[in-house]
Each structure stands twice: as structure tokens, then as C-alpha cells.
Amino acid sequence: MKITKAEVDAVALLARLELTPEETETFTGQMDAILAYVEKLNELDTSGIIPTSHAVPVENAFRDDAVRPSIGVENALANAPDRVEGFFRVPKVIE
């Protein structure tokens, strides 16, 4: 499968990228090479291979939830440059 410049332009549009003609030419060649590699992988016989999502067997290791003491409001606000009624005061950033 050959990638066309129009397809590269379409992908660039979806990614909101503005490409120069030289970049379009470069990416056309690079995407062609990638697809050629994928086509080569499709030639492999994988009929006896079990589908996996990880190369090694990995499982999540969860810990039990435990209640622990927190640092407290006063300690949390101790170094705050500005606070009011037990809260951090920050500059307004949204009008």
C-alpha cells in the first residue's frame, strides 16, 4: 500500500499540523516505510501464538487502604504566602 501526499495532508489536517511541501514529501516516504514494515509483519504465521496484551505476565499489585494521620490544616498552610479562613488564597486566573 502506497501512501499518497493527499493522505499525508489529511492526517496533518486531523492533527492540526501545517506542513511545508518538503515536510509532506518527507512524511510520505516515512509513512510508506512504516506501512511496508507492518505489511511485512502481516506475513508472519501467528496461528499458534496466544494473543497477549503484555509481553510478560504482569498484574496490578494493590495495597490495602489504611487510614493514616494527615498533616493537618495548620501545617499544610504554614508556608502559604496568603491564606484566608483555613484555605489557600491564590491569584485570580480566570476572568
UniProtKB/Swiss-Prot annotation:
Q: Which UniProt keywords apply?
A: ATP-binding, Ligase, Nucleotide-binding, Protein biosynthesis
List the Pfam families hit by this protein, alphabetically: GatC
Superkingdom field? Bacteria
Q: Does the keyword Ion transport apply?
A: no
Looking up InterPro entries in the UniProt record yields: Asp/Glu-ADT_sf_sub_c (IPR036113), GatC (IPR003837)
Q: One MF term from GO for this chain?
A: ATP binding
According to its UniProt record, this protein's enzyme class is ligase
Q: Which SUPFAM superfamilies does this UniProt record tie to the protein?
A: Glu-tRNAGln amidotransferase C subunit
What EC number(s) does its UniProt record assign? 6.3.5.-
GO BP annotations of the record are: glutaminyl-tRNAGln biosynthesis via transamidation; regulation of translational fidelity; translation
- Catalytic activity of the protein: L-glutamyl-tRNA(Gln) + L-glutamine + ATP + H2O = L-glutaminyl-tRNA(Gln) + L-glutamate + ADP + phosphate + H(+); L-aspartyl-tRNA(Asn) + L-glutamine + ATP + H2O = L-asparaginyl-tRNA(Asn) + L-glutamate + ADP + phosphate + 2 H(+)
HAMAP family, A to Z: GatC (MF_00122)
Tell me, how does this one assemble? Heterotrimer of A, B and C subunits.
Family to which this protein belongs: Belongs to the GatC family.
Q: Which PANTHER family match?
A: GLUTAMYL-TRNA(GLN) AMIDOTRANSFERASE SUBUNIT C, MITOCHONDRIAL (PTHR15004:SF0)
In Swiss-Prot or TrEMBL terms, this protein is called Aspartyl/glutamyl-tRNA(Asn/Gln) amidotransferase subunit C
The scientific name of the source species is: Geobacter metallireducens (strain ATCC 53774 / DSM 7210 / GS-15)
Identify the gene encoding this protein: gatC
